[in-house]
């Protein structure tokens, strides 16, 4: 793109005025799915506009996957530094958890600067692909136009042949609990300026588990309040049990079968008192973090054009991402199918392939089956396909065979028992050919290991296919191709 064209594009963005501008494709939401779809559409020559309310990259870049993983790295490194003595390293240094120092404010500055750089990269990539973008809050008018209210309260109006709603989600707050607003959401976790000495995380899902693990690894007195007996209840039993037991062993205070009933604040100290329905109180708390779920981010005037929502207020779409209104589409967290960044990216690209690409893509759609997912807990956990329970429900107990292995990875061979974390693998197979319909792993590097095995399961691999692969020794992953 020439300098003149670049300048012209900047001028267009600055002077999109009161006149109504028309596009081939208008995308509401600058998260992973929206950005991917807009860039792919523009690559086919579609005149494309992307509207984002806050910062490019959406939840993943700004309040989710990316800053979370950076925090996880810090916490994981803190834990591993403590293992050095087992390998006779730094024997003259006190590398215990009690002696750990972590400069949270300085680390936050570096992390936030990294995220800001990513925001800029997103903007530059959009410009490179020829996508126009504006910042502001989008809403539909009754005649199907899209109005954007910008930060300066100016309003711009657009029309388009095709419109994608990819606005993502937002955290849920327990508004009925007295004092709930003394706590913050998982989004606001990244805004904490100082490390809390004592923290309570509420919620058994992967977000709560990851945040509690980060705090514990960095030396905070970490409490996790869950309604059931185990964390990660949407995962296979082996993951639920292993992560729960390991967290307890590593010092996370898990309050099982508990619900928060009231939150009080001592105005003189700023400390919180968390009351549970078990009669127990957690006092002298510095920070309370709610991770009890997320809901679709709407407020777009979808009712003005008749877009149908389900009982959870998620946009109803068919297998091709079509909403109930012609030429209006939706994907990502706002539809609630598989709420993962790579899924939104893949769905966004395939939608644009279908709408603007060559004939070979006219029936392309996203496959939501066998999507690998991981939890950056301590240790990591990963899963693809059916859990053992789901497989039995679907195929019958007599048609399901399960292979299990539990061991200590070689990394821990030099350590005392108290410092070891378990590795546990499970294959769920069905039918005479023993097709692998589920794989569940817990242990170091599970996220990296799962990616390759995810390809195998997506291709329909059988237990015999796994067995035919020569193991890489010595590794933990070799266990998956030697299970008996």
Swiss-Prot record:
User: SUPFAM superfamilies in the record, alphabetically?
Assistant: FAD/NAD(P)-binding domain, FAD/NAD-linked reductases, dimerisation (C-terminal) domain
Q: Which cofactor does it need?
A: FAD
Residues holding NADP(+): 204, 207, 210, 227, 233, 293, 339, 374
| Cofactor binding comment, as recorded | Binds 1 FAD per subunit.
Catalytic reaction annotation: 2 glutathione + NADP(+) = glutathione disulfide + NADPH + H(+)
The record's section on InterPro entries has: FAD/NAD-bd_sf (IPR036188), FAD/NAD-binding_dom (IPR023753), FAD/NAD-linked_Rdtase_dimer_sf (IPR016156), Glutathione_Rdtase_euk/bac (IPR006322), GSHR/TRXR-like (IPR046952), Pyr_nuc-diS_OxRdtase (IPR001100), Pyr_nucl-diS_OxRdtase_dimer (IPR004099), Pyr_OxRdtase_I_AS (IPR012999)
Q: What are the entry keywords?
A: Cytoplasm, Disulfide bond, FAD, Flavoprotein, Mitochondrion, NADP, Oxidoreductase, Redox-active center
The record, for Pfam families, names:
Pyr_redox_2, Pyr_redox_dim
**Binding-site residues for glutathione, renumbered to this chain:** 32, 39, 122, 242, 349, 426
Q: Could you tell me which cysteines form disulfide bridges?
A: 60-65
Sample GO molecular function, one term: glutathione-disulfide reductase (NADPH) activity
List cellular component terms (GO). cytosol; mitochondrion
Q: What does this protein do?
A: Catalyzes the reduction of glutathione disulfide (GSSG) to reduced glutathione (GSH). Constitutes the major mechanism to maintain a high GSH:GSSG ratio in the cytosol.
Miscellaneous comment in the UniProt entry for this protein: The active site is a redox-active disulfide bond.
Per its record, how is this protein called by name?
Answer: Glutathione reductase
> Organism, per UniProt?
Kluyveromyces lactis (strain ATCC 8585 / CBS 2359 / DSM 70799 / NBRC 1267 / NRRL Y-1140 / WM37)
Its taxonomic path starts at: Eukaryota, Fungi, Dikarya, Ascomycota, Saccharomycotina
Task: Tell me the name of the encoding gene.
Answer: GLR1
């Amino acid at each position: 793109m020439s300098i003149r064209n670049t300048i012209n594009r900047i001028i267009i963005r600055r002077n999109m005025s009161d006149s109504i501008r028309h596009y081939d494709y208008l995308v509401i939401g600058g998260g992973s799915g929206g950005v991917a779809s807009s860039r792919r559409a523009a690559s086919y020559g579609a005149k494309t506009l992307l509207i984002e309310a806050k910062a490019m990259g959406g939840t993943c870049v700004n309040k989710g996957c990316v800053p979370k993983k950076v925090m996880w790295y810090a916490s994981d490194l803190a834990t591993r530094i403590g293992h050095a003595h087992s390998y006779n390293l730094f024997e003259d240094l006190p590398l215990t958890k009690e002696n750990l120092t972590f400069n949270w404010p300085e680390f936050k500055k570096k992390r936030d600067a990294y995220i800001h750089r990513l925001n800029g990269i997103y903007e530059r990539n959009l410009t490179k692909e020829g996508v126009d973008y504006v910042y502001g809050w989008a809403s539909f008018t009754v005649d199907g136009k899209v109005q954007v209210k910008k930060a300066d309260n100016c309003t711009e109006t657009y029309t388009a042949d095709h419109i994608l709603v990819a606005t993502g989600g937002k955290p849920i707050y327990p508004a009925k609990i007295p004092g709930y607003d003394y706590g913050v959401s998982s989004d606001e976790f990244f805004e904490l300026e100082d490390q809390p000495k004592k923290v309570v995380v509420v919620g058994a899902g992967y977000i709560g588990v990851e945040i509690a693990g980060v705090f514990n690894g960095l030396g905070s007195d970490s409490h996790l309040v869950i309604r059931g007996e185990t964390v990660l209840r949407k995962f296979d039993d082996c993951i639920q049990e292993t992560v729960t037991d390991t967290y307890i062993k590593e010092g996370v205070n898990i309050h099982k079968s508990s619900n928060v009933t009231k939150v009080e604040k001592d105005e003189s100290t700023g400390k919180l008192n968390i009351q549970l329905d078990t009669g127990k109180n957690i006092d002298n708390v510095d920070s309370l973090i709610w991770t009890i779920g997320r809901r679709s981010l709407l407020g777009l005037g979808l009712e003005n054009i008749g877009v149908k929502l389900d009982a959870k207020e998620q946009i109803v779409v068919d297998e091709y991402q079509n909403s109930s209104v012609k030429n209006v589409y939706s994907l990502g967290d706002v539809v609630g199918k598989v709420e993962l960044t790579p899924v939104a990216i893949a769905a966004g690209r395939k939608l644009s392939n279908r709408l603007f690409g060559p004939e070979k893509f006219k029936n392309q759609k996203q496959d939501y089956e066998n999507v690998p997912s991981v939890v950056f807990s301590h240790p990591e956990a990963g899963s693809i396909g059916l859990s053992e329970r789901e497989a039995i429900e679907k195929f019958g107990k007599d048609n399901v065979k399960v292979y299990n292995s539990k061991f200590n990875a070689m990394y821990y061979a030099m350590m005392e028992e108290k410092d070891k974390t378990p590795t546990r693998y499970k294959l769920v197979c069905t039918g005479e050919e023993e097709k692998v319909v589920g794989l569940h792993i817990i242990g170091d590097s599970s996220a990296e290991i799962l990616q390759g095995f995810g390809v195998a399961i997506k291709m329909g691999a059988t237990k015999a296919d796994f067995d035919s692969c020569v193991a890489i020794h010595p590794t933990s992953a070799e266990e998956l191709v030697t299970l008996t």
